[in-house]
C-alpha cells in the first residue's frame, strides 16, 4: 500500500469515527433534554363512601436531572373542594448531578358519592409544568346522608 493510499484510508476512518461520535452525542443529548411524562393511578378506582383512595404518580422517561421537574411543588386537586399542596426544601440544582423525584403518592378520603377527576400537578412557582388526571367513582355508602 502506498503512503498516499494509507493516508487516505486513515483520514476516511477518522472521519467515520468523528461522524459516529457526533451522532451518538446528539442522540444522548436529545434523550437527556426530553421532558419526562407522568402516569397517575388511583386505587381503588371505585368503591363506596366513605372511600379512602391512594393516588400514585410515576415520572417516566426523560432526563434524571430534568431541571423543570427538580424540586417542584406538588399539587393534588381531589375535585371535592380539597386541594393539597406541598414543597420540599432542596439543594440548589446542578445539571448532571441533581436527580428528580420519580414517584409521588398521597391518600385521600372521599366522603360523598360522585365521579371525581383527581388531578396531579407539578409546579415551579405559579407555573404548571406538568399535570395528569384520572377519574374515580364513589358510590353511596350506608352512612351517607344520615
Model regions: which residues?
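Bacterial N-terminal signal peptides
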Residues: 10-20
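Bacterial N-terminal signal peptides that target proteins for export
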Residues: 2-12
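Extracellular/lumenal mature domains of secreted and surface-exposed proteins
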Residues: 2-3, 23-146
Amino acid at each position: 500500500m502506498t503512503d498516499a493510499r494509507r493516508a487516505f484510508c486513515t483520514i476516511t476512518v477518522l472521519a467515520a469515527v468523528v461522524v459516529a461520535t457526533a451522532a451518538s452525542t446528539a442522540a444522548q443529548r436529545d434523550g437527556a433534554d426530553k421532558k419526562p411524562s407522568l402516569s397517575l393511578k388511583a386505587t381503588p378506582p371505585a368503591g363506596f363512601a366513605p372511600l379512602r383512595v391512594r393516588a400514585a404518580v410515576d415520572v417516566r422517561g426523560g432526563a434524571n436531572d430534568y431541571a423543570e421537574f427538580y424540586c417542584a411543588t406538588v399539587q393534588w386537586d381531589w375535585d371535592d373542594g380539597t386541594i393539597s399542596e406541598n414543597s420540599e426544601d432542596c439543594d440548589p440544582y446542578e445539571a448532571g448531578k441533581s436527580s428528580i423525584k420519580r414517584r409521588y403518592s398521597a391518600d385521600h378520603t372521599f366522603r360523598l358519592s360522585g365521579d371525581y377527576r383527581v388531578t396531579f400537578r407539578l409546579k415551579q412557582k405559579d407555573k404548571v409544568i406538568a399535570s395528569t388526571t384520572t377519574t374515580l367513582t364513589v358510590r353511596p355508602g350506608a352512612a351517607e346522608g344520615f
